[in-house]
Amino acid sequence: MARLSNQSAARFVELWVEKANKRALAIFRDSAQRLGEEANKPEARGGKMPVDTGFLRNSFVASKDGMPTKQSLPLPLVLISVQLGETVYVGWTAKYARRMEFGFEGADKLGRTYSQAGKGFMRSAAQRWPQIVNESARAVKSRIR
């Protein structure tokens, strides 16, 4: 029976922790990316994102500093630098994004009357978060051995 010295046991644990940290970061980044893709998936491809001109869909951005603004970056560029423990904020900068997500009933500032049901593209993606993380974990586990 082989015996591990204290040094080799410590090195084994060190390598295991390093791999676990790499996996955790990869799962975090991959899950956030998948969440964004799910929320932005067009209705024509089975998602809930309505697409007419593509402006709403293309206004999807992310930030590590707070809710995104028009100056924020695309999600993949934010995820490159994000670390475990940081928060990633995502959203759409199109002025009508909130109405498309939640719907709108009533008159707007110009007196136009609406009775529009919400599409729930972000909420439905957020509800799938546990499944998205599990999918990411399986994918990352096969990549980082």
Go through each PLM region and give its residues:
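Short, intrinsically disordered N-terminal pre-domain segments
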Residues: 1-15
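Protruding loop/beta-arch "assembly-hinge" segments enriched in small, turn-prone residues
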Residues: 116-145
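Short, low-complexity, charged/polar segments at coil/turn and helix-coil boundaries
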Residues: 11, 15-107, 145
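Short histidine-centered catalytic/ligand-binding loop motif
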Residues: 17-24, 108-126
